[in-house]
Amino acid sequence: MTDLRLFTSESVTEGHPDKICDQISDSILDALLTQDPTSRAAVETLVTTGLVHVAGEVTTSGYVDIPQIVRDRIRDIGYDSSEVGFDGSNCGVTVSIGAQSPDIAQGVDRSYESRSGSASTDAHDLQGAGDQGLMFGYASRDTPVFMPLPIYLAHRLAERLAAVRHSGELAYLRPDGKTQVTIGYEGLVPRTVDTVVLSTQHGPQVSQEDLRREVEEHVIRPVLAAAAEIGIELDSRDATLLINPTGKFEIGGPKGDAGLTGRKIIVDTYGGFSRHGGGAFSGKDPSKVDRSAAYAMRWVAKNAVAAGLADRLEVQVAYAIGKAAPVGLYVETFGTAHVPEERIVRAIRETFDLRPAAIVERLDLLRPIYAQTAAYGHFGRELPDFTWEALDRVADLQSAAGL
């Protein structure tokens, strides 16, 4: 296998500065939705040495204690003392929250179709998209959960790194960390693990030699073994393992780098295997199609691949602000389609209602479910609340496509 093509994806742990911000923003959103499921929110967070700043726009009938939510989330991640470089109990928290612009609200609350007299009697025609934009969804047969293999493994490594820290198995680890996986592909088939890069914050008491040996033993090898157990066959015998390749990594988290909500959009999605419309997810309620339509596109793509319409499928949807119906739908199958692509597009249109209100209703998105999406990927984790991962439209798509 000398002609393998190498594809790489990365992930980060929950203690990475940008991911701290995503989790804070989504924790605030969850609290708002708990108080008022119709809350509109766009919450942005910045963290830096000793300070958290929360800003954005919120319209709600509820009340939430934002500083307390911030502190609780930071401590849960593991930043609970000055020794690790950040302390949720003592850091500064500033809040600058305003109301959603009425100019935006008017288009969401009363759609273009409603205002122009072209709306049907269907209530889903009455809510417009919260912004213009384009969103992508993707699925492939690389893994049992229909995710590309490089990002799947990168997430599992990051999750495992956090797990052995929280459990005390590797007690010297600290919250910040990054993972990266390079997979060798023969055509469209993943064959080898070429390189694993793992950088983890740690305390001063451990040598780099011990850290590298124990991270390989307790993190990398168990993740590769677990992948094999679910049928992912990879040759990792010649894999290059680069663990803390710069040496010591004691200063991390917000003390090492400032963090911002929405700066890990490729980590959040498909690891670069699919295109991205540019809109981040965290801190946004589901009236924002940046989030809800991206979730719907994952639902569409996963069901389409599971239905046998293609082995790899990317789907794009586009919206105009204030308009209920999408303005565009596009499918790319990278030469793997089992039926003509135009038939796939027709089947998707027949099977899925992609108006924003219909997406929110079908995927039950007005729930406080978002903090759990904010680390280790919004897609490919088949958790009970992740309705967009359900394979519940397979038969409908097969019927609509004539299979």
Curated annotation (Swiss-Prot):
Binds 2 divalent ions per subunit. Binds 1 potassium ion per subunit. It catalyses: L-methionine + ATP + H2O = S-adenosyl-L-methionine + phosphate + diphosphate. Keywords: ATP-binding, Cytoplasm, Magnesium, Metal-binding, Nucleotide-binding, One-carbon metabolism, Potassium, Transferase. Mg(2+) binds at D18. PROSITE patterns: ADOMET_SYNTHASE_1, ADOMET_SYNTHASE_2. It is found in: Cytoplasm. Pathway: Amino-acid biosynthesis; S-adenosyl-L-methionine biosynthesis; S-adenosyl-L-methionine from L-methionine: step 1/1. InterPro entries: ADOMET_SYNTHASE_CS, S-AdoMet_synt_C, S-AdoMet_synt_central, S-AdoMet_synt_N, S-AdoMet_synthetase, S-AdoMet_synthetase_sfam. It comes from the Bacteria. Its EC number is 2.5.1.6. L-methionine binds at E57, Q100, D257, K288. GO terms for molecular function: ATP binding; magnesium ion binding; methionine adenosyltransferase activity. Residues 100-110 are annotated as: Flexible loop. Residues 106-126 are annotated as: Disordered. Its cofactor is Mg(2+); K(+). SUPFAM superfamilies: S-adenosylmethionine synthetase (SSF55973). GO terms for biological process: one-carbon metabolic process; S-adenosylmethionine biosynthetic process. It is an enzyme of class 2 (transferase). K(+) binds at E44. Catalyzes the formation of S-adenosylmethionine (AdoMet) from methionine and ATP. The overall synthetic reaction is composed of two sequential steps, AdoMet formation and the subsequent tripolyphosphate hydrolysis which occurs prior to release of AdoMet from the enzyme. PANTHER family: S-ADENOSYLMETHIONINE SYNTHETASE. Belongs to the AdoMet synthase family. Homotetramer; dimer of dimers. This is S-adenosylmethionine synthase. The lineage of its organism: Bacteria, Bacillati, Actinomycetota, Actinomycetes, Micrococcales. The gene is metK.
